[in-house]
């Protein structure tokens, strides 16, 4: 189930947005891993049960010919397994917060932007798996989760940006 909302409020320039998703992603068929496990009936990898976001933007005139926009968003993800095995390692649930401030010309030719992403510096696993070329000294599931490598999203970032459109 998914739902999206975009509300143009009665306050000029203020918009509110939100998204919500509920998922019950389960391996319904036979799926045999390299370690011999059948994942049938287990939770799918990288599939949080609940995810969503909430944000607001405010856009207004600053001076003759110039406008500003302030925007902030908070995104939530429930915990999820990041391996392809039964009882795989899990990424804990998390919140990510972003903010931006823009000063731009009404004709759209110039814009100055300050963008902050992942302000809480939340390090989140986005993918993971066995390290290629490693030979385990054990067998079964424990061998599969011995030597794992993960990819994470970026931590806190700030960007100062200028755009010019011809």
Protein language model features and the residues they cover:
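Generic, ordered loop/turn and secondary-structure boundary motif
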Residues: 45, 95-97, 120-121
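Intrinsically disordered, low-complexity peptide-like regions
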Residues: 36, 71, 95-96, 116
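Flexible, surface-exposed loop regions and adjacent strand-edge segments
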Residues: 29-39, 87-92, 128-137
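Gram-negative outer-membrane beta-barrel transporters
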Residues: 1-82, 161-165
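C-terminal beta-signal and adjacent terminal beta-strands/loops
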Residues: 76-83, 103-166
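Exposed loop/turn and edge beta-strand positions of beta-sandwich/beta-sheet ligand-binding modules
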Residues: 50, 66, 95, 110, ...
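Short glycine-rich, acidic/polar surface loops and turns
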Residues: 98-102
